[in-house]
Amino acid sequence: VFEKKTTTIDMFGSAKYRNYDYGGDDHIAVVHTENLPKLASVFVTAAIHKSSHTGKFDYGHNFYAKDADELNIFLPALDGKPDYALMETLISAVQKLVIKDVVQYADRKIAAIKEVALKL
């Protein structure tokens, strides 16, 4: 069992943040992000995914933990160190935009249903 708050990279190079304890096989790599703030971990996971999920890995050529050493990920930095506060701010902003879009979508669906119902 692996600890929650870590990131996995599967055999295809797809990275996922895990906020729960989980099990895995030898086709996943675990990146230890548990000591980072949650939203910074989500940002780091997205950066890993962008670098690793490129189509290079498939059933014939799996991603393994050793491949993680070859990844180049780009993170915002401040004074030569990762800027985790900025990462958290960016992910928080993206989450708010997604929530706003979902609410607007739901409002449009409700309005359309009401319009159809009034015609019945």
How would you describe each model-predicted region?
Residues 71-120:
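Amphipathic alpha-helical coiled-coil/heptad-repeat segments
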Residues 1-72:
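DNA target-recognition domains and sequence-specific DNA-contacting regions of bacterial/archaeal
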